[in-house]
Curated annotation (Swiss-Prot):
Residues 795-806 have a biased composition (Polar residues). It comes from Haemophilus influenzae (strain ATCC 51907 / DSM 11121 / KW20 / Rd). This is Dimethyl sulfoxide reductase DmsA. Heterotrimeric enzyme composed of a catalytic heterodimer (DmsAB) and a membrane anchor protein (DmsC). The keyword Ribosomal protein does not apply. One of its GO terms (cellular component) is plasma membrane.
Amino acid sequence: MSNFNQISRRDFVKASSAGAALAVSNLTLPFNVMAKETQRLNENNQERIVWSACTVNCGSRCPLRMHVKDNRITYVETDNTGTETYNLDHQVRACLRGRSMRRRVYNPDRLKYPMKRIGKRGEGKFKRISWDEALTEIADALKRNIKKYGNESIYLNYGTGTLGGTMAKSWPPASTMIARFMNCIGGYLNHYGDYSTAQIAVGLDYTYGGGWALGNGMADIENTKLIVLFGNNPAETRMSGGGLTYCIEQAKARSNAKMIIIDPRYNDTGAGREDEWIPIRPGTDAALVAALAYVMIQENLVDQPFLDKYCVGYDEKTLPTDAPKNGHYKAYILGYGNDGIAKTPEWAAKITGIPAERIIKLAREIGSTKPAFISQGWGPQRRSNGELISRAIAMLPILTGNVGIHGGNTGARESAYSIPFVRMPTLKNPVKASIPMFLWTDAIIRGTEMTALTDGIRGVDKLSSPIKVIWNYASNCLINQHAQINRTHDILQDDTQCEMIITIDNHMTSTAKYSDILLPDCTTSEQMDFALDAFVSNMAYVIFADQVIKPSFECRPIYDMLSDLAEKMGVKEKFTEGRTQEEWLRHIYEQSREKLPELPTFEEFRQQGIFKKVDPNGFKVAYKDFRDNPEAHPLKTPSGKIEIYSSRLAEIAKTWKLAEDDVIHPLPIHAQSFEHYGDPLMEKYPLQLSGFHYKARTHSTYGNVDVLKAANPQEVWMNPIDAEPRNIKNGDMIRIFNDRGEVHINVKITPRIIPGVVALSEGAWYAPDKDRIDHSGCINVLTTQRPSPLAKGNPQHSNLVQVERL
């Protein structure tokens, strides 16, 4: 058992009381009130300040300076080091989510002690048990299922509730403490892909190779003349000092570049920063790109020398020998390919909702302005045809020769600088099988039917076992963030299928209610760790996330609890190698200092709180070496070049078993798929439903913080043109529904969303009634579990619904 000191319920309530009173009395200015209290305490020299971090999944990490008195966090500040200039060692200022960390630590939803389910999964009925009882139950379940089904039956579920830590890190699965533990006892069923980037990661890999397509650093837009953002919204998704909003503002001011936003929703990255917003129907980006390409080809605005030297498949000259005649991109665009349709602006206007004249103007702007920074966020690809969309958008910088130069980009989202800080070793996984992260529910009910050709299984031809045990660490993806909640609920309620669900978390989330064993985890504030994967554009940094307070109640760090579990499984020495958590951190830090000699000593870093390093090579330019010398620095594609036509995809399209309306194509074409604009299902459900990331939360993290919920209420966005015939007024309670479920939520009537589309931010905590109607605005009641064709990823923006006033 751990020897960690605990905080009592009495102390916990004391620490929460000021925040609770504030939540009732003054929700509008909580941070100002707390600042006055902190100033008074500082004057009396009764506080100390300890460095910590916000380690949620917003795209980076942010330092927090915790004010502590009598083992209680009284106030949270952020980085106060460095400059205000983005390409120097600038201050990494946490957003209001990170600064509300105290409200996460002292939240009424905190898990306080180990618990065991006593009702049905999802009912949230548990009884308190001891740590020894909990770990014994887990050990027995692991032994029983491994003996009966093998290690392939043990699954590490996708979860990003704590990211970037060295010890406290929930994703990717192979880098977690649970992976290290499982590898000590024979391994586990892994997953590949992620809910953020499944389609683009696979799609652009076939274009650029290397497993993950790179982009120029966002700071490099100071060298550009034109910025075109397809669904890229850092002002909400990456809004902190560890994000990119401030960087964009400063870099754009230096370049004076025109910025065009292409998005169904007028997002906060616009908000007056943009020069033009072009609304587009969701899922039609590839049609727009095809029409832009048509104009650029017809008006000789493409970079033919670049296409000839660096690319495969643009025209007949570079088409692979195994491709059919007229199988190249130019033929597809001009209408002498297989479909025989010229991709004119008039053709695209009917699909995208963008007038043909504006398409022509945009094509000329992109084709005649160089360099141009063209990038896509991760929203456009999160669709049923998302792999094709991601590849299509990348065609714009390829056609115009903007790849590998300053001020240009690849069409991918921006990349950033990183430093070689050593990670915690997690040992080798003996299990070879890996499933698409989105198909874990299928792996429960039909695991042994899933194959490489039908379901994208990797490492083996076919799964040998269904999933019988799930580790769910810092994850709300078991229910809340996974699609089609009602189907998942039905699968998980049958505990003869998946026999054990173990959740390790800080709070009683929607997912936690489906657990068999609940283990209360320490927050970042209650343990020592390093926060890694921290960067913004051309600066990387590491945060010393020190232990700010003692663990609350019976909460324990994950390394501590797994060390005891390893002892019950007879592998403690292999798991710990005789080190405590702090001893591991000191060991890793000394290894990191060998790679980064400029790092201070451990104790100096502990006082300093943050280590920053600016890229000595200046702004990042993706594939610059390839552009400078393609023979010496080929891409990691079969041809070594940019593959507009992919022979690998042509082969997959022939051999994989696909649904009739699934499309895998060697070219980045526009293809309709399920629940798209123009689908016959629109007769019943005429509105497209799209999700977006909301500044009130990071996915579902911070979704239970009172002041953030009050400042940013959950609403569905609807255009006045759609609201008027339904007699819906701003603020009305409405029902959104389809065959998969129903949500009741207040409506925001706004011209900031294109007609024919409603938008609902993801991450709201699922709150069903007895009829399965959700009252929180959880979009995943309405999304589908049907995967995308190639990545087998989550198409959570491909939804058709109807909306009615209640």
